[in-house]
Amino acid sequence: MDDVVRQIVIRGRVQGVGFRYWTMREAIRLGVAGWVRNRRDGSVEALFAGPADAVADMVARCRNGPGAARVDAVEDQPVAANAEKMIRPGERFSQLPTV
């Protein structure tokens, strides 16, 4: 299956509930590369790269998130031109600073 890249924004009660750590753990478990970060507007943004089925599974998992989260929406975003370059060398998946 071909590799894909998806950039999403998750809205709801998604900060202060372990969402970034959960996302990183789930992505590594699925073999998905990328990053996750908080945004100042209270949302969480993530980029997932890898086999199409694994990326789709990761996005689907984000619709529920960890137990303490309340996900109101998961929005697909256009992949920013530099988004893939933000995957840190030597790290398959990472948490980036808040933007």
Swiss-Prot record:
EC number: 3.6.1.7
SUPFAM superfamilies: Acylphosphatase/BLUF domain-like (SSF54975)
Annotated ranges, domain Acylphosphatase-like: 5-97
Catalytic residues (UniProt): 20, 38
Signal peptide: none
Annotated TM spans: none
Pfam families linked: Acylphosphatase
Gene3D superfamilies, sorted: 3.30.70.100
InterPro entries linked to this entry: Acylphosphatase, Acylphosphatase-like_dom, Acylphosphatase-like_dom_sf, Acylphosphatase_CS
Domain of life: Bacteria
Catalysed reactions, as listed in the record: an acyl phosphate + H2O = a carboxylate + phosphate + H(+)
Family to which the UniProt record says this protein belongs: Belongs to the acylphosphatase family.
Protein name from the UniProt record: Acylphosphatase
Lineage: Bacteria, Pseudomonadati, Pseudomonadota, Alphaproteobacteria, Hyphomicrobiales
Gene that produces this protein: acyP
